[in-house]
Amino acid sequence: MIASIRGILIAVAADHVVVETGGIGWMIYAPRPVIAALGDIGATVRLFTYLLVREDSLTLYGFETVEQRQLFETLLSVTGVGPQAALNLLSSGTTDELRLAIATGDVTRLARTPRIGKKLAERLVLELKGKINVKGLPTGAAVTPAVAAANAELSEALISLGFTDAEAAAAIAALPSDAPPDLEERVRLALRYFSAS
């Protein structure tokens, strides 16, 4: 597998770039924000790549970070999600926003992405529930020390009830911003999140 490519940017299109290294120009498909961030033609660039091998083609996909590439691979594991749909999802916002939308079951946000309808958005949430790493994801609002302490307490309570770290983090991310600091009420809200998903 070709893990990354570093070279001179020699061409830019809407959905791909060409990077020359060692006298070879590599056509690399990438999310739109990645293409926009590469800079001008002639710049030295580095992309973390994923090589998709099919019976009739070898296609390279490029990403800004290893985490973004891993998320692309995770998206491809979902039935019905091909490389173009995965690129569209990665182009629809930041990697953290996409991970949070999947972890919190935000089907409406996912379905707004081109080539992703409501059914495929629901399948994404269903098949990736618990597989998306939600540690360190923003929860929307700035977290005060009191809220952070309440979230840590809630996480411990949910884990003691048998939920995984990822499930606990997803439930915490889904809490409303005006959730009371009381542990009992926060557990009740988190359990409502699990029963709704």
From Swiss-Prot:
Classification via Pfam families: HHH_5 (PF14520), RuvA_C (PF07499), RuvA_N (PF01330)
Record region (Flexible linker): 146-148
Localization (cell): Cytoplasm
GO terms assigned for molecular function: ATP binding; four-way junction DNA binding; four-way junction helicase activity
Region (Domain II): 65-145
Primary location: cytoplasm
GO cellular component: cytoplasm; Holliday junction helicase complex; Holliday junction resolvase complex
Ranges annotated as spanning the membrane: none
Stretch list, region Domain I: 1-64
Region of interest (Domain III), residue spans: 148-197
SMART domains: HhH1
Complexes and interactors: Homotetramer. Forms an RuvA(8)-RuvB(12)-Holliday junction (HJ) complex. HJ DNA is sandwiched between 2 RuvA tetramers; dsDNA enters through RuvA and exits via RuvB. An RuvB hexamer assembles on each DNA strand where it exits the tetramer. Each RuvB hexamer is contacted by two RuvA subunits (via domain III) on 2 adjacent RuvB subunits; this complex drives branch migration. In the full resolvosome a probable DNA-RuvA(4)-RuvB(12)-RuvC(2) complex forms which resolves the HJ.
Name of the molecule in the record: Holliday junction branch migration complex subunit RuvA
Phylogenetic placement of the source organism: Bacteria, Bacillati, Chloroflexota, Chloroflexia, Chloroflexales
